[in-house]
């Protein structure tokens, strides 16, 4: 952990407890971040336990390099590749627990150069892995009005999506204006585009910045693939512990766990034999307890934990 950007792991003990860690078990931390969850898992493992952590952020990989432990392996890549990594390390069906801590880490938000925050001026980037893909600034220069509107509405759930998109396109087409290359420029533009009646407690740019970040990093597709991958590599009684930070993420996690715990749907109105019904398969997982929210004490200590939700499921 650097001296400049500190990170407090959200729902740390609850998410680790949800894994029901065995000292000699095999675990995957799909989101290493700054290592809070990984280090806690390692502290609970015995000599024969193993932890494989994943992250696509080069800064996270550098932080992981500080852990000198033969039980620990760091993998540089997106967590959507979890099933592939498990195959490479011969872990399919042997993993006792998978942890996913979704969203942006505090160091990413606090480092203005990453371009995630509307509170600090920096390059308008927002890529989790700055070495791949295109920055938000480039996408905003190329996307049309309908695409920008759709992204803000779909991933930011912002009712002023069209209004904001029009302001962005108008700015882009005005040759007297500087191109949108800084977070402060975009935040100011969105604030000015917001109706004067705007009364939300959040900054007017909150939802749009979330939307652009989710879109540019394909976050929801990554989560969907990671959840399916985790379910496919867990051992019987293996646990999946997932922390989400906004309604879109939590909705995906909730639906996935519910679907996996119910099994495939039997088509209505089509007579099937018992053998045919069995062939459809059965439930793959079961949910463990109810959704867990941060305590008032944790929120006071770490305000960014306010919107977090932890859900746990177990492989059957």
UniProtKB/Swiss-Prot annotation:
Alphabetically ordered keywords of this record: Cytoplasm, Methyltransferase, rRNA processing, S-adenosyl-L-methionine, Transferase
Catalytic reactions on record: cytidine(1402) in 16S rRNA + S-adenosyl-L-methionine = N(4)-methylcytidine(1402) in 16S rRNA + S-adenosyl-L-homocysteine + H(+)
A cellular component annotation (GO) from this entry: cytoplasm
Annotated GO MF terms: rRNA (cytosine-N4-)-methyltransferase activity
Pfam families attached to this UniProt entry: Methyltransf_5
Enzyme Commission number, as recorded: 2.1.1.199
Transmembrane segments: none
The protein's enzyme class: transferase
Intracellular or extracellular location(s): Cytoplasm
Binding site for S-adenosyl-L-methionine: 35-37, 55, 79, 101, 108
Entries under InterPro entries matching the protein: RsmH, SAM-dep_MeTrfase_MraW_recog, SAM-dependent_MTases_sf
Signal peptide: none
GO BP: rRNA base methylation
Family to which this protein belongs: Belongs to the methyltransferase superfamily. RsmH family.
Function: Specifically methylates the N4 position of cytidine in position 1402 (C1402) of 16S rRNA.
Name used for this protein in its record: Ribosomal RNA small subunit methyltransferase H
Species the sequence originates in: Vibrio vulnificus (strain YJ016)
